[in-house]
Amino acid sequence: MKLLYLFLAILLAIEEPVISGKHHILRCMGNSGICRASCKKNEQPYLYCRNYQHCCLQSYMRISISGEEENTDWSYEKQWPRLP
């Protein structure tokens, strides 16, 4: 019987306590997105996370696939060509 109590004590010490209502949020794309089974209305799915869920990014996020940091200056001159 003592062995059973010792086994239960060790098992409870190893297990992480379960806290209801709190879920670990898995982040993706350099902490810009959230891994979800389905994206919200204002989010776009982009690639997949480690748990095969969608990496959901806000629709206004710009993604550079070249790996280089882009200049994100949104001035008027850079958006439209100059008129002669």
UniProtKB/Swiss-Prot annotation:
Query: Where does this polypeptide localize?
Result: Secreted
Question: Which InterPro entries does this UniProt record tie to the protein?
Answer: Defensin_big_dom (IPR028060)
Q: Which Gene Ontology CC terms are recorded?
A: extracellular region
A molecular function (GO) term: lipopolysaccharide binding
Q: Which gene encodes it?
A: DEFB119
Q: Which residues form the signal peptide?
A: 1-21
Keyword Signal, does the record have it? yes
What does this gene product do? Has antibacterial activity.
Q: Which family does the UniProt entry place this protein in? A: Belongs to the beta-defensin family.
Question: Does the UniProt entry include the keyword Signal?
Answer: yes
Species in which this protein is naturally found: Hylobates lar
Q: What domain of life does the UniProt record list for this protein's source? A: Eukaryota
Q: Which UniProt keywords apply?
A: Antibiotic, Antimicrobial, Defensin, Disulfide bond, Secreted, Signal
In this UniProt entry, which cysteines form S-S bonds? Answer: 28-55, 35-49, 39-56
Which GO BP terms sit in this record?
antifungal innate immune response; defense response to Gram-negative bacterium; defense response to Gram-positive bacterium
Q: Write the protein's name.
A: Beta-defensin 119
